[in-house]
């Protein structure tokens, strides 16, 4: 019936035209968003910057050349829906082993040992002042920016201004942007030399601007806190960060140990500290038969089993948790500790291997956590990540139910823990 086709096509065309007009009205163009950005700078940002003490000369000079960086992740431009987030519950949950890829660890250790020789005098002075061993600082430097070799392709002010205007965390980045303006106002670095990651982390230590203001130091004595091109300033700033977070002079980060089968793995965590001598009295011993340092025997020490009985086991000092202040991850702090030991002593990978826990999703672990919570256990946050509270609660539940504690989620527990 061809005579019905023309009105139908006309109606369809009209509908598509309406949708196109509606879409155009709902979603502003890039040019319009750029215009709104400029208005935001003068109307919203400047009053906040002025109140924070930023000079008008600095603000005008810096912000007149700032531009939106549309390449950044997780942007939420005005008039557009927020970016879709992949449900973290669908992320894979597996053994921590891949985090410690041996080829990478060896390469970083080799470079670290060479740099330890090159900067021996500087590192000695930093350790004398702050009490943080050089290998720890080198390990942080290597992990964060590959000893300064990683490219920082972003201008920090562009990144921070873009994120302050149209990201999902506008308030946070507005504060960081104003702190970046404080750094420029203080003449530590020029705006065009303030390079960062895509998240706005600055220089070789990867400090956010707020951390720079609090922890960066001028160690080479040139009058500027330069964490971009000055190695002494970068290393000393990291040392100052650790000290301000509680680093204890004269103590190591921790030791790989063997935990006897009769000693429960569900005793870990910073809230269950004991003198190292008390742990040793249970039969826990250092790998290789080495003695624990005498100065540590009466000092607070914690059990750490990042993969339960499926991987290496440790006794750690409070300095381990200070390393977590840099990045709140057990694996990150272990990476730094192991890399520092490789640089200092030529040691290798952990003695015990990382075991296979099967193939699971974070949603599987989250389900286990939720079940444990219903049974009265404290898992910390039920987020699908196996933190120390989840690990020890699993161990306690296993022991209570006649199972050998492993203190880590695995495929075999999915069916049992209901």
Residue ranges and their predicted role:
Residues 27-127:
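An acidic, Gly/Ser/Thr/Pro-rich helix-cap/linker signature
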Residues 10-20:
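Bacterial N-terminal signal peptides
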Residues 42-59, 64-71, 128-131, 142-146, ...:
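Sec-exported extracytoplasmic/periplasmic mature domains
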Residues 317-329, 338-385:
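Acidic, Ser/Thr/Pro/Gly-enriched interdomain connector segments
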Residues 360-365, 373-417:
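Short acidic, glycine/serine/threonine-rich helix-capping segments at coil-helix boundaries
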């Amino acid at each position: 019936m061809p005579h019905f086709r023309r009105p139908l096509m006309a109606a369809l065309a009209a509908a598509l035209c309406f949708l196109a007009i509606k879409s155009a009205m709902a979603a502003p163009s890039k040019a319009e968003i750029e215009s709104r950005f400029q208005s935001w700078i003068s109307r919203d940002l400047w009053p906040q910057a002025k109140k924070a003490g930023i000079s008008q000369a600095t603000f005008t000079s810096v912000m007149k050349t700032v531009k939106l960086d549309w390449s950044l992740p997780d942007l939420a431009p005005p008039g557009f829906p927020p970016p879709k987030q992949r449900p973290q519950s669908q992320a894979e949950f597996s053994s921590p082993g891949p985090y410690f890829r041996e080829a990478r660890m060896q390469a970083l250790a080799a470079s670290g040992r060479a740099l330890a020789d090159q900067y021996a005098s500087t590192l000695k002075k930093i350790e004398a002042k702050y009490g943080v061993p050089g290998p720890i600082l080198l390990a942080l430097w290597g992990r964060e920016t590959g000893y300064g070799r990683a490219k920082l392709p972003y201008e920090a002010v562009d990144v921070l201004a873009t994120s302050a205007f149209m990201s999902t965390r506008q308030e946070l980045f507005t504060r960081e942007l104003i702190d970046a303006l404080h750094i420029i106002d203080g003449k530590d670095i020029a705006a065009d030399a303030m390079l960062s990651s895509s998240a706005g982390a600055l220089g070789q230590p990867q400090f956010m601007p707020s951390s720079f203001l609090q922890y960066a130091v001028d160690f080479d004595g040139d009058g500027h806190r330069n964490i971009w091109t000055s190695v002494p300033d970068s290393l000393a700033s990291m040392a100052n960060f650790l000290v301000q977070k509680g680093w204890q002079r004269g103590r190591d980060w921790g030791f790989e140990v063997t935990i006897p089968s009769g000693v429960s793995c569900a005793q870990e965590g910073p809230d269950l500290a004991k003198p190292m001598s008390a742990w040793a009295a249970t039969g826990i011993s250092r790998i290789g038969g080495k003695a624990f340092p005498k100065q540590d025997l009466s000092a607070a020490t914690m059990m750490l089993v990042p993969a339960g009985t499926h991987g290496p086991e440790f006794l750690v000092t409070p300095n381990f948790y200070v390393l977590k202040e840099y990045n709140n991850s057990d694996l990150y702090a272990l990476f730094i500790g192991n890399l520092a030991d490789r640089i200092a002593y030529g040691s290798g990978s952990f003695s015990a291997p990382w075991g296979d826990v099967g193939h699971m999703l974070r949603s599987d672990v989250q389900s286990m956590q939720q079940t444990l919570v219903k049974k009265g256990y404290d898992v910390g946050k039920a987020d699908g990540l196996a933190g120390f509270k989840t690990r020890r609660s699993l161990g306690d539940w296993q022991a209570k139910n006649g199972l050998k504690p492993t203190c880590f989620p695995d495929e075999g527990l999915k069916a049992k823990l209901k």
